[in-house]
Each structure stands twice: as structure tokens, then as C-alpha cells.
């Protein structure tokens, strides 16, 4: 390592970024080299340059704040005597072994016949008999009867509406013997109609399920007499036992750091205000592989611990080996620290929860020893774009009906949505670790949508899964615009299709098999609807272009006329409209009955509902096309990536909207032209579909504008209770987000290399703490040489991650950059500071403030 003399201006610049008093700075300014500077900071004049720069990490980190870190007992040393921050508790490993999946029924039978079985797993318990289990089974049989009966009646009406009614006249012997073209002409219309009828039945049954779910949810919320609600099993004020320790875990990956730690701080402070902080620990579990964001996370963790005095309560861990995505992140936590906690609450990066809500969840778990998971119903809030505010309004107004309805049908065999829920640790560790799906292709490998699977495994192991749909204090955020929502939907679509491979896995409860099926239908309904419309258009073309076949069998005495029953068409259309829109109307009726002030009043909430209904009708065909593409992409094995540009105001640029929605617009125009050519009168029926596709570009762009969203808020449109009377947790989150953005750390990796204090923090939080070994030293030397040669702009991601994880290499790179005054690194660092007027420059202590001496020689 170079030990050249330090330029006075470089040394002064270096010292200016350490929070020193004037006396300390003047004392250290007499150093003739950076090697001497690090020796004096470390208090060891005889140390080599390599040893000194590593030893100076502690003084550089603690100068001005040593007492704070020492009082919290945050400073420690690793096995090689290097300083480190205690950013996580001591590891106490627990065995976490996923059970291999046997998804093929035939292979499973063969293995059983040949005497081969899986490795023994922890014994599963039987869920104790309870009245709710019998009631739930009866309710689900009733639901199935209602859905099938309603679908059969609608199918009968649909069959009567279709024009061709001659299947009974088709003679199969005649079909086989006649020319192929005659067979096609004769059978084609009836084959089309049969396909349309089958698709209609599937889609109508899906709509029927949603209708009955919303209707029962409406009755539950209106009467308030749900004796099976899980939240009624606790008094709500009993003290939490000391052994009921709970870990709040927040898995993150390349997230918006200011918002993440603002929500974490608001949640932490709310728990502290509840008086139960000693029962909770907080873990930020990072899978971030962007080094700039990773360094920003480190600084944000230190800041939030200082601001809340959360040292020893708020922990941070960034994985170096990112396996199995989010489920692997949780597995890693369970393996390292899960045995120390009785419960775990999983938070999303945008989650906020009140201390009372979290305390209530723990009390409910204590009161229900057979519950494995209790899921809250998060309220969407905090967004300002027009699109997000309409979605917030929809989920806040209609969502409670569907959530309460799900609880009515499922009771203790319900959903888990992956966040804002409490989990019993022991059965989760023993039974809910997820093995990769076997095989090759798009539907093999790590499970993407882990939440439904974990709920199914928890129930299979004999534990209940409940929705506490009426528990307040649980919040989340929604995507700000349509394209961001669709980007998320693509991942969810692939995950739900993968999960269906588990439909026949041994031991799954029928309810959770149905959950896998509904998860698939959430996205498969889109291509089914699309093909239904395509086949309907094909039937129109057939009816228009092909000569009707009035006589389709030999010696037929009377012609078979195409039929039209307008009364059946009107009845079926009216019924479908009722099923689709009555839940929205029931939601408004419920709000009128309970009080509409928090939603802007009766008139405004009704007007908002009508506007949201129109907007959802505009977007439904757009989502249909995208979801159809997502399903096809999953089956064809196309990569599920979607790179959108960074947007400061969350708005969609016109260029991106044209690129994403352009093909849909062309499809809508071509489809409308075809139908107009075939039968102009039919265009009125198809206008809502093709019109939405044609308008998709401006609708996507305009709805993403924050200005329109705020204007609607000023007019009390799409108002939600969290905006009318904002909870303290959301107010705090908004305040801390603004503060964090003002002081956000940019170009984090460059600062971790160059900045004296940031480098010390990164070295103290680095986790690759290897001993001395020749291969490791050779690898370090190679990485250092590469970093010096190519500079920050040319350094690849793998090398960046390796350097950030290695405290020795990072300290050496820091020393070498300053010793050689490497312009490639220092100039980028200076530019980063100059371009960021709110950069968190370290404060310089006043000259009259006493500081401990840093000079050791």
C-alpha cells in the first residue's frame, strides 16, 4: 500500500469530514502522511499502514459519539480483534429443514409401493375439535351449492340466448361420411357456441363466488354479531407474559430506504408508547444487492437507533447469499434467531402497525393456543396520485366486505397474505420451511408466492389460520400507478401459477386446495375472459359471413331457424350486472348506516363510488390484456422482468405509456374496425372493451398524476378515514419520510469507500470476517487492484458487494484512495456531495466543546 506524503489540502479535506473539535483537527493536521494519521487515530505509532487503517475504524466511527455506542454496549470485536458493531443478537441456531415436495401423485404412489419415503419430519398435531370447524364446513358446502346452482341457471339462460340450437340434429354417422368441408361448415358454429358456454360457466361461477363472499361480509359487518371472530377471544388489556417475546421482521430488497425506516421508526415509537416495548425486538432483514442502497440502509439503521434509543432493540442483517428470495430471507432469520422468540410479526417494506395492534395480536395468540397465524386486514393509505387514491378508496370501501366474507366462509382455515400478520414460531420453523419445487422450467425452483403455501402448511400441521378482519392499526401502501401495479401483478401471477402444482400434495386441507385454485383463477380469469370475447367475435363473424345451415340432417322436414330470445338476454345481462356491482352498492349502504363523515359525507362517498366504478370499468380490459400476457409468459417460460425508469413523482411518462399500452391501443382499434365491418350494431356491446383499450395510454398517464390526486382530495373525493382523522403512526411515518428524504444518502458505495466516517461505519457493519489466509489475501489484493484501476464507474456489482462485505479490503481501499489521492474515486465523491445540497455532512463540533484526545503518539 502506498505511503506517500499527504497533501495538506487532502489531509485537511479528510479531517473536515470527521466531527472533530478545532484543537483535535489542528493536532492531526501536522501528520505528514495518511499512514501517520491512521496511526495517531488508532493510538499506535508502531502499527503498519494496513494495521493502522483497520485499527482507526473505531476512532473514526465513535468520535463524538463514543459514549452513546458504549452505553448501549454496541461495540465489540471479532475473532481477529477488529472492531465491529453489534447490529444483530448472538446467533443461536435452530434446525430448519424443508420437506421435499412430492407433487406427482403417480410417483408418490410408486414410492409408497416400493417402500421409499421421505426423511422423517416433526410430528404433526391434529387441530382439536371445535364448533367452528363444523360450522365452517357447513358454510362452505352452502357456498358451493349457491355457486353451482347460480351458474347452472345462468348457463341455461346463456344456452337459450345463443343462436344455434341444433346439436340434437347432428348425426355423427353422417358427419363422418360427408366431405370434410361440409363437416366444418356444419359443426363449426356449434363448436364455437359450446366453447363459449363452457367459458361463460367458469367465469360466471368465479363472479358468483365473489358476490356471495361480499354479501356475507356485508351481513357480518352490518349486524356485528360474528361470534366466531378471533378478535373477540381477548379482553384486549391483559398484560403480555414475559416469555411471549415477539420479533418484528421486515424483509427488504432494494427498497426506498427513507420510507422503509420512517415506517419502522413510527411502528417502534408506537410500540414504545403502548408500554410493551420490552416484549418486542425489530429486525430489518435485507436482501439488497445494490451497494448504494445497502450503504444507505446501514446509515439509516444507525440514525433510527440513535433517534429512538433503539440500540439493542432494532437489528439489521444483510444477507450475502440471497437464496429463495423472501422465503429464504425468513428461513435465515428463523435458523439464526427464531428459537429465541415465541411469535413473529412479518412486515412489508411499506407496512406500518400501531403498538396497540401488535400488542393485541400477541394477546390473541396467547388466548388462542391452537392458532398458528393471525392475519390482520391492512388498510391502504399514504398515496397521493389519482390512481392510488382511487385504489385506496376501493380497498377501504369494498375491501372490508370481502375480508369479512372470507372469514365467514373460512374461519380458522383462512388466508395469510405474507405481511402484517403474527405467526407462532415453533410450528412455523418445524413445518413451514419451503423446499424448491422439483423439476425444470418456469414452474420449478424457489416458490415465489410463499404466503399461501405457508398458510397451507401451517393448517396441515394442525394449527389454525385466522383473519382478524376487524382489528385496527394495520396499514400498507399501494402502487402509485397502473404500470407499477402491473409489474407487481406479473410476479404474483407467476407465483400463483407455481403454487397450483401443490394442489394435490398429500395432507393439504380442502380449503387451502381451494385457496390455490382461487389464486390461479385471480389471473387465469383474464385469458378466459379474453378468449370468451374472441370466440364471441368469431361467432359473430360466422353468423355474418357463413350461409346459415337450415337443414343439417337428411330428410329433415322443417328448417332449423337461428333463434333469438331478447327476454333471456336482458335477464342474464341484468343478473350479471347485479353480481358485479351490488357489492359496491352494499359497501356504500354500510357506510351510510355506520357513518359517512370520514368518507366525505354521503353525497361525496356516493359520487366517489360512481367515479371509481367508471374508472374500474375503463381499466378492466387493460388488466385483462396484461394478465393474459403474464399467464402466457409464465407458461412459455419468458423472463418475468420489467424495468421501469425511476420516477420522483410516481407519475408515468408518456413515452413509457406508449411503449407499454401501444399494442393494446392498436388491438382495440383493429378489433373495433373488424366488428364494425361485420355488424355495426354489435359494436355497442363491445364498446366498453375496445374503447378502454383505445384510451389506455391517456388513462394510464393522467391517472398517475399527483396533482389530480391532491385536487380530488381537496374536493373530498376518494376520501378515506385515515385521511379524515390520520392516526399518529401514519402522521409520524409521513413526517419521518420527509425528514429522511431531506438527508438521504446518495452514491452510498463511493461514500463508503472515500468518506472517513461512512467507511468506518461500513467496516464496522461488514459481515465477511475471515481470518488470515493466503487465498483470501490474494483475492483481496486482486479486488483492490481492480477497484483502483477501473474506479467506481467501472467496478462490477460482484466486486462492489465483495468489498462492502469485507472490512479489511474496504479499509485498505479507503486508505489507498486517500494515500494516492485517487481522482477517480475522490472526484466522484466530491461531485456527489456537491450535487446533493442536503447531504448529511457530519457536523463539526464547536471549538469550545471539549473532546477527548485522539492523538496517541
From Swiss-Prot:
Enzyme class, UniProt record, top EC level: transferase
GO molecular function: hexosyltransferase activity
Biological or metabolic pathway of the protein: Glycan metabolism; osmoregulated periplasmic glucan (OPG) biosynthesis
Main localization category: membrane
Keyword Transmembrane helix: yes
Entry keyword Repeat: no
Topology term for the membrane: Multi-pass membrane protein
Species the sequence originates in: Pseudomonas putida (strain W619)
SUPFAM superfamilies per UniProt: Nucleotide-diphospho-sugar transferases
Gene3D superfamilies linked: Spore Coat Polysaccharide Biosynthesis Protein SpsA, Chain A (3.90.550.10)
InterPro entries the UniProt entry points to: Glucans_biosynth_gluTrFase_H (IPR023725), Glyco_trans_2-like (IPR001173), Glycosyltr_2/OpgH_subfam (IPR050321), Nucleotide-diphossugar_trans (IPR029044)
Family from the record: Belongs to the glycosyltransferase 2 family. OpgH subfamily.
Localization in the cell: Cell inner membrane
A Pfam family this chain is assigned to: Glycos_transf_2
Transmembrane residue ranges: 142-162, 196-216, 515-535, 572-592, 606-626, 682-702
GO CC terms, sorted: plasma membrane
Keywords of the record: Cell inner membrane, Cell membrane, Glycosyltransferase, Membrane, Transferase, Transmembrane, Transmembrane helix
Catalytic activity, EC: 2.4.1.-
Name of this chain's protein: Glucans biosynthesis glucosyltransferase H
Record's function text: Involved in the biosynthesis of osmoregulated periplasmic glucans (OPGs).
Matches recorded under CDD domains: Glucan_BSP_MdoH
